[in-house]
C-alpha cells in the first residue's frame, strides 16, 4: 500500500471543503473544524426573510467529508508548527501533516466605527441571520415604524 502524504485542512466551510474535494484520494486529508455543521451561506439571507429555517442551511460536515474519502475531526486548532508538521487541538490531540491549509473564513470588519459593535447585528453565520430574523419579527409585531440600514455592499449586504 502506498503511503499518501498527509494534509491537514483547518476550517471546513466552502474553502476548506473545496480544498479537500480537490485533493481527492491522492492525499490523506484531515479536516478540522469546531462545528459539526457545514453552513450553506449563499442562501443565508433567506433566514432573515423567513423563507428558510436554520436546519435547511446546515449539513452534517462529517458526512460530507467522509463521502470524499477523508477524515473529519470536530475540534478547534490551537497551534500550528509548520517546521515539525504538527497541528495541535483544544482536546490535546496532535495531527501530523506534510502540508497544511488554513481556511478559517473571514470576520466582519467594523473599521473601528463607533457604535458598530453596540448597535448592529452581524450577518456572517446561520445563527446571525436567524437572530436578525427574530429581531425583525419582534420589531414588526411591536407596531412601531421599523427602519433597517444595511452597512456594506458586499455579497451579503446586496442580498
Task: List each language-model region with its residue ranges.
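Beta1-alpha1 glycine-rich phosphate/pyrophosphate-binding loop at the start
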Residues: 2-71, 148-149, 155-159
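FAD-binding core/adjacent interface of flavoenzyme oxidoreductases
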Residues: 1-4, 69-147
Amino acid at each position: 500500500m502506498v503511503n499518501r502524504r498527509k494534509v491537514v485542512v483547518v476550517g471546513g466551510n466552502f474553502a476548506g471543503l473545496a480544498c479537500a474535494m480537490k485533493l481527492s484520494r491522492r492525499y490523506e486529508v484531515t479536516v478540522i473544524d469546531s462545528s459539526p455543521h457545514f453552513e450553506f451561506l449563499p442562501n443565508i439571507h433567506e433566514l432573515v426573510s423567513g423563507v428558510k429555517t436554520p436546519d435547511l442551511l446546515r449539513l452534517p460536515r462529517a458526512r460530507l467529508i467522509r463521502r470524499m474519502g477523508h477524515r473529519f475531526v470536530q475540534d478547534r486548532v490551537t497551534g500550528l508548527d509548520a517546521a515539525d508538521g504538527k497541528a495541535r487541538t483544544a482536546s490535546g490531540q496532535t495531527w501530523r501533516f506534510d502540508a497544511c491549509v488554513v481556511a478559517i473564513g473571514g470576520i466582519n470588519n467594523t473599521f473601528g466605527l463607533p457604535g458598530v459593535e453596540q448597535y448592529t447585528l452581524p450577518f456572517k453565520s446561520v445563527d446571525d441571520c436567524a437572530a436578525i430574523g427574530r429581531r425583525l419579527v419582534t420589531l414588526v409585531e411591536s407596531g412601531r415604524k421599523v427602519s433597517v440600514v444595511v452597512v456594506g455592499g458586499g455579497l451579503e449586504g446586496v442580498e
